Amino acid sequence: MATETQPRDRTVPDSPVSDVTYDLMQALTSKLEAIEAHEMYREDAHGDVRQLFDDMLDDDRRHAERLLDALRMELR
């Protein structure tokens, strides 16, 4: 039995923001929480493990900036 996949519209009729805006806000929140956690983990680490957390922080910050830019564009 083949079925076509239809895009889901999860928008709540009275919601003040679109699904995309909400998703971007949630993703940004998660990324900022990850940055905070990785900064703490980095303090405990040394050597290669510390470098790993440094690399993760660089990536997390870059991703957070991209999410913020996308959110700004969505809110225009």
Where are these regions (language model features)?
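Iron-associated oxidoreductase/ferritin-like identity signal
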Residues: 1-76
